[in-house]
């Protein structure tokens, strides 16, 4: 098939992964990015691959779905995973990155690549005249697609968008935190300083914080959009509304932590994670929120150690838009009625940084196979990548976005003890992925 010239709309994680991978494969790539001409409500810098919700790419453990997915991407030579690994900051068993350094490195690599032409302007319409300029189009506009491109895409697919809201956690300066109260430490680690700064709370202090959280003023949504929260980025106040102890079994859980100032386990703990290598800025883990700025300024200061904290960025809410992929897309992740238009990233219904990278990489592999008139089977659904792709391909009564977890892969056919199940999932995934890598992917590379 004659595929040489490819346009990508959107310079986020998925779009950048597509651009770098396709350029490596030898395609001529035109990457459109609307910044700095136009910013979404959640983006702040003109850099490509900007991380807006958190600087964490989550666990590196192979006994987790996300850890497996990252390892599979590394073995597929993902450009963005390679950059992330070089920009990592201490985060225990997780992979967190210096977000500015990460985005700068991605931007520099794309701007200097001879096979990539970066155009800094909004693509407002998927018109016939635009489509005719390229052999293939990849829409990787992310969950914050501009109204213009959203309306154009909606016209093409003839179906309404679904909406849910993502919340961003506040960031504070490290030197404004009271270290006579807070302490460094990671759960269950006895030695070393630890990768998280912990603010311990007594029962009484937690009650005051919890009560204020429930009463805090929230930002209201557009009246015409239904509010649907993604479970993995649930606003802290929405979690609190589920019950007094919900936070204690979630982001504020104290298990595995001992306060060195008292020698006791706190009743609750708010953890802060470094935003950069020198740990000068930290984000409030699990505190993504739609509280108004004044409410945040008051309520988060109730946490012990944060009474005089300096906010670098308050938390905020933004719309997340995605399509009903199983209904709209082919197995090539292309529109059923416009097969020259492919979709990649969070707009397809994958949720999360690594998942967006994975989707972009997979679309690139699909286009390589198409250009060689070859078919490629996607990885087995027992693998992390295969399970994620199965989710956005398999019809369901109410399709919702998802990040990768073991609930997306087939359950064991034999009886496995609960404590051994994650290890079993990981071993099965590794075996099946290697088999696919050496028996399927090798034929198109």
UniProtKB/Swiss-Prot annotation:
Subcellular localization: Cytoplasm
Cytoplasm listed as a keyword: yes
Any single Gene Ontology cellular-component annotation: cytosol
Record-listed FAD binding positions: 10-15
GO biological process per UniProt: tRNA methylation; tRNA wobble uridine modification
Enzyme superclass (EC): transferase
Entry EC number(s): 2.1.1.74
Cofactor(s), by name: FAD
Catalyzed reaction equations: uridine(54) in tRNA + (6R)-5,10-methylene-5,6,7,8-tetrahydrofolate + NADH + H(+) = 5-methyluridine(54) in tRNA + (6S)-5,6,7,8-tetrahydrofolate + NAD(+); uridine(54) in tRNA + (6R)-5,10-methylene-5,6,7,8-tetrahydrofolate + NADPH + H(+) = 5-methyluridine(54) in tRNA + (6S)-5,6,7,8-tetrahydrofolate + NADP(+)
Superkingdom of source: Bacteria
Alphabetical keyword list: Cytoplasm, FAD, Flavoprotein, Methyltransferase, NAD, NADP, Transferase, tRNA processing
SUPFAM superfamilies: FAD/NAD(P)-binding domain (SSF51905)
GO molecular function: flavin adenine dinucleotide binding; tRNA (uracil(54)-C5)-methyltransferase activity, 5,10-methylenetetrahydrofolate-dependent
One protein family per Pfam: GIDA
NCBIfam families xref list: gid_trmFO (TIGR00137), PRK05335.1 (NF003739)
HAMAP family named in the record: TrmFO (MF_01037)
Family per similarity comment: Belongs to the MnmG family. TrmFO subfamily.
Role according to the record: Catalyzes the folate-dependent formation of 5-methyl-uridine at position 54 (M-5-U54) in all tRNAs.
Name of the protein described by the UniProt record: Methylenetetrahydrofolate--tRNA-(uracil-5-)-methyltransferase TrmFO
Source organism per UniProt: Lawsonia intracellularis (strain PHE/MN1-00)
């Amino acid at each position: 098939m004659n595929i040489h010239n490819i346009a990508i709309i959107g310079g986020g994680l998925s779009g950048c992964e597509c651009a770098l991978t396709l350029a490596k494969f030898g395609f001529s790539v035109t990457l459109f990015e609307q910044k700095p001409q136009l910013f979404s409500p959640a983006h702040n810098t003109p850099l490509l691959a900007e991380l807006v919700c958190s600087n964490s790419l989550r666990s590196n453990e192979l006994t987790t779905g996300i850890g497996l997915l990252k390892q599979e991407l590394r073995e597929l030579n993902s450009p963005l995973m390679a950059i992330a690994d070089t920009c990592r900051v201490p985060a225990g068993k997780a992979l967190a990155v210096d977000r500015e350094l990460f985005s700068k490195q991605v931007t520099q690599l794309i701007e200097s690549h001879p096979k990539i032409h970066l155009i800094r302007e909004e693509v407002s319409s998927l018109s016939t005249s635009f489509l005719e300029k390229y052999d293939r189009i990849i829409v990787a506009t992310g969950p914050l697609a501009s109204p213009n491109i959203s309306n154009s895409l909606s016209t093409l697919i003839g179906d309404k968008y679904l909406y849910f809201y993502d919340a961003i956690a506040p960031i504070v300066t490290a030197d404004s935190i009271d270290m006579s109260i807070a302490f460094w430490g990671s759960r269950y680690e006895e030695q070393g300083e630890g990768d998280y700064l912990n603010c311990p709370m007594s029962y009484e202090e937690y009650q005051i914080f919890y009560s204020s959280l429930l009463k805090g003023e929230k930002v209201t949504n557009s009246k015409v959009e239904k509010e649907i929260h993604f479970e993995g980025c649930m606003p802290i106040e929405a979690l609190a509304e589920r019950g007094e102890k919900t936070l204690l079994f979630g982001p504020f859980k104290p298990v595995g932590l001992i306060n060195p100032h008292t020698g006791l386990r706190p009743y609750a703990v708010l953890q802060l994670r470094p935003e950069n290598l020198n740990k000068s800025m930290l984000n409030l883990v699990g505190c993504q929120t739609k509280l108004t700025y004044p409410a945040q300024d008051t309520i988060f200061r109730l946490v012990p150690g944060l009474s005089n904290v300096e906010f670098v960025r308050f938390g905020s809410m933004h719309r997340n838009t995605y399509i009903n992929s199983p209904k709209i897309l082919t197995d090539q992740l292309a529109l059923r009625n416009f097969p020259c238009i492919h979709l990649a990233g969070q707009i397809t219904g994958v949720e999360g940084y690594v998942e967006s990278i994975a989707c972009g990489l997979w679309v690139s592999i699909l286009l390589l196979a198409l250009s060689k008139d070859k078919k490629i089977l996607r990885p087995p659904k027992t693998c992390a990548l295969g399970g994620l792709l199965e989710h956005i391909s398999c019809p369901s009564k109410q399709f919702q976005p998802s990040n990768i977890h073991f609930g997306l892969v087939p359950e064991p056919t034999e009886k496995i003890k609960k404590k051994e199940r994650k290890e079993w999932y990981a071993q099965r995934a590794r075996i099946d992925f290697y088999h696919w890598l050496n028996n399927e992917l090798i034929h198109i590379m």
